[in-house]
């Protein structure tokens, strides 16, 4: 039987002052342990895997916090996350390359751009894994009789209307978050 492991609220940032994730070694070792499960393992990151919402983006050498959550900025932020948390990315890659293992992401309020296909493709490239090893479940996970969603969907201030999660603004696709 396939094992299911769920992790939430890691909030890995870009290694700057807003990044308070300091558990690279512990998380890497945990993921390394999961890759050996008999029958395979599905690792589910149930929201806030990354903390893109608090990360600045460098534009012309200046750190800015864009109000609009566009895919280009999110991809730049994920590049910084990988640089800051390389051991975790390595562990996820090795986990996914094992037969029977798979990875699932649920969108959280700290990483709302994960709903965007361009950001998803970029993350898969950064992880160095085959696309068929990862599922982007959107705002909820329903499988094996299990239902998961990130807690922000029950918070009046952070709940996202899933049918309005992405829109266009001046030719740019943006992810919605209720705080803007």
Protein language model annotation of sequence segments:
Residues 1-180:
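Extended recognition/assembly regions associated with phosphoester-bond processing machinery
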């Amino acid at each position: 039987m396939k094992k299911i492991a769920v992790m939430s609220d890691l909030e890995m940032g870009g290694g700057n002052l807003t990044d308070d994730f300091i558990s690279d070694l512990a998380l890497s070792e945990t993921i390394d342990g999961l890759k050996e499960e008999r029958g395979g393992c599905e690792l589910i990151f149930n929201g806030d895997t990354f903390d893109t919402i608090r990360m600045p983006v460098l534009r012309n050498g200046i750190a800015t916090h864009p109000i609009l959550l566009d895919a280009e900025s999110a991809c730049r932020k994920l590049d910084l996350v990988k640089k800051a948390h390389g051991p975790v990315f390595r562990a996820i890659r090795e986990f996914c390359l094992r037969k029977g293992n798979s990875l699932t992401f649920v969108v959280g309020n700290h990483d709302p751009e994960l709903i965007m296909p361009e950001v998803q493709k970029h993350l898969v490239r950064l992880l160095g894994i085959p696309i068929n090893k990862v599922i982007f479940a959107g705002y909820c996970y329903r499988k094996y009789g299990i239902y998961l969603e990130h807690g922000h969907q029950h918070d009046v201030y952070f709940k996202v209307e899933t049918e309005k999660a992405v829109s266009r603004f001046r030719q740019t696709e943006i992810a919605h978050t209720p705080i803007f």
